[in-house]
Amino acid sequence: VTAHSTTRLLSSSYDGPLYRVVRDSDGAYLDVTADSRGYAFSELQDEFCRDAVCRISIIYDQSGKGNDLTQAAPGTFNGPAKGNFNELPIADMAPVMLNGRKVYGVYIMPGMGFRCNNAKDLAINDEAEGIYYVIDGTHYDSGCCFDYGNSSTNGRAVGTGTMETTYYGTSTAWGRGNGEGPWIMSDMEAGLFTGYDAKLNDV
């Protein structure tokens, strides 16, 4: 359904940009592409954003379906940005090395977020799907909810069991895993699941 990455190509058939950065000072933007090895051409961003604050405004979908992630619009919960949108992440806050090459991940703080409310070919109801992502295991909080996956398509909490996303953090409102966390849990709307039920899973 989607393939999002700011660090590298995920599909050999994709030849578009990985993500877009926008400068706070003048609103100018730049699409960051991949180099010949498939890694993000971070030098483009560094030059464009020199002496300026840049934010990631689009994470392009590499699946070919056009399910790009953009600034999350207001829904059940309003964001802190203009128009009650979510904030956009600062573009250089998550540098990481990939095979000796500096690239940038996405550093999400409370109030930041992306969405795609018109995604194509989503899994519906109990249709099968898989979710795979790479995160910084040291970056998390206890709030609800830092998710990635197949969420509702209108930004609203529309009912129990209407999402299929993955959560990473130490929230214990619905359940928890073994030890002090953080834990990977499934956020299906109105509940974080560590196993079959929303409760302690000490496996």
How does the language model describe each region?
Residues 56, 64-202:
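Extracellular glycan-recognition modules
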